[in-house]
Amino acid sequence: MGRTSAFDRDDVIRAARDVFWARGYAETGVAELEEATGLKRSSIYHAFGSKKGLFEAVVARYLDEVVRSRIGRLQQPDAGPEALELYIAEMRAAIASGTPRAQAGCLLLNAACAPVVDDDPDVRALVTAYTDELRAAIAAGVDSARPEISAASRAALSEVCASLVIAALAVARVDPDAADRSLGAVHTAVASWVSA
């Protein structure tokens, strides 16, 4: 009979998430993960296979708890024209809050800016899947907000909105004011569509 884990997997993932979020994937050492999780290296590797395996578990949880809880509403069949406006307003409020998580920026886009992404196709694939999912959600929001315009015009507006949101999330860590300006531009545009 195999040994059962003497730790709570959810607690370990949350603790590791905080370290990866604050330090980034490339800059996080296993010793830091040991300290944050209370586990030894061997337990981390046994439970997750590797540092990358733990990061993948963190990303899955981050997507479910942080990202999809926000963008999922944009993709609901009954999403109204105001859904995208509300999403952008929430993003602005989160960045303006000044909380440690807001100041840390986006976990996945921070990873995208690290040199490891160039060398690690698995991490690159995680980041690409995230930005694709974000783009699809924003496209659904634009579709709800502007059903009267052509599909090509909605696609172009979606890409502009998504690019500004991704830019804002990418710079939130180092320049929250620039992030707010990018999101503010999107919010103003989207609010004008909804009120038109």
How would you name each of these model-derived features?
Residues 11, 15, 19-58:
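Helix-turn-helix
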Residues 9-10, 30, 52, 56, ...:
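Short, structured helix-loop boundary elements
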Residues 1-7, 146-149, 196:
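N-terminal intrinsically disordered/low-complexity leader segments
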Residues 61-66:
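Short, basic, alpha-helical segments at the C-terminal edge of helix-turn-helix-like DNA-binding modules
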Residues 15, 19-22, 69, 73, ...:
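Solvent-exposed, amphipathic alpha-helical segments
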Residues 98, 120-132, 144-193:
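Hydrophobic/aromatic-rich alpha-helical bundle segments in the mid-to-C-terminal region
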Residues 83-84, 99-125:
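Amphipathic alpha-helical segments used for helix-helix packing
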Residues 57, 71-104, 148-151, 157-158:
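Hydrophobic alpha-helical connector segments
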